[in-house]
Amino acid sequence: YEAIKNIKKELTEKPLIGFSAAPWTLATYYIEGNITKDLSIIKSFSYKNSKEMDFIIDLFSDLISQHLINQIEAGVDLIQIFDTHSYQMDYYMHQKYSTRQVKKIANSVRKKYPNIPIIYYSKIFQFLDKDVNNYLNCVSINSNISLKEQKKHFKSDICLQGNLDPLLLAEGGEYMVKEIKKILLEMENNFFIFNLGHGILPQTPVENVFKLVETVRSFKKKV
C-alpha cells in the first residue's frame, strides 16, 4: 500500500484506480495453477468438494474486501474488480461464485466508503442481477461484445467501460484510429469510459498508446 501512497503524491489531480481479482478468478489460479482452457480442474473440484469450495470463495471474498478497503485508505479514488474467468461458469455456478460474491464485496466496501465508485470487469453479463446499478457504478466490457447492444441490458445510470481490442492497439495505424472513433460515436450520449477490452499487451508500442489518448481526447462528433 506504500506504492499507492507514493503514486498519489505524484498524480495530484489525477484519479488512481485500485483493483483486485474477483474470488472465482483468484480461485482459478489458486486451484489450477496453470489455467486449463475450460477450467475443468476448478469446476470438477467445486462439484466434488462443494463445502471446501464455498469456504475458499467466502474466504477470498472477505480478504478481497479488506484488500480493497486498504487500497482506498492508502489513497485510490475508485476500485475495479476483475472476474476474467467467470465466463466459463453456467448460470447457477455464476450466481453462487461470482454474482453474489461481487455484490458481497461491493456492499462490504460501501459499508465503510459509501461513495467510492466501483467498476466490474467480466466476459459475461447476462447472468448479472437486474439491480446491478445498486452496487456497481460501471461495467467494463471485453472486445467481443458490442457496447451499444450491451447497454440495452443495463439501466441508464450504469456507466460502461471498454472495449478496443488490445491487439488492435498493439498494431496501431489508421484502422486503430477508425475503430476508436467508431466506439466513441457509438457511445457518445451514454455514461462511458473509453478503455481496452482487456489488459494492454506487452508488445504494444508506447507511441500507439499516445495516439489512442490523443484520438480520444480530441474526438468531436461530425455534424
Model features per residue range: what roles?
Residues 2-223:
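Active-site loop segments of alpha/beta catalytic cores
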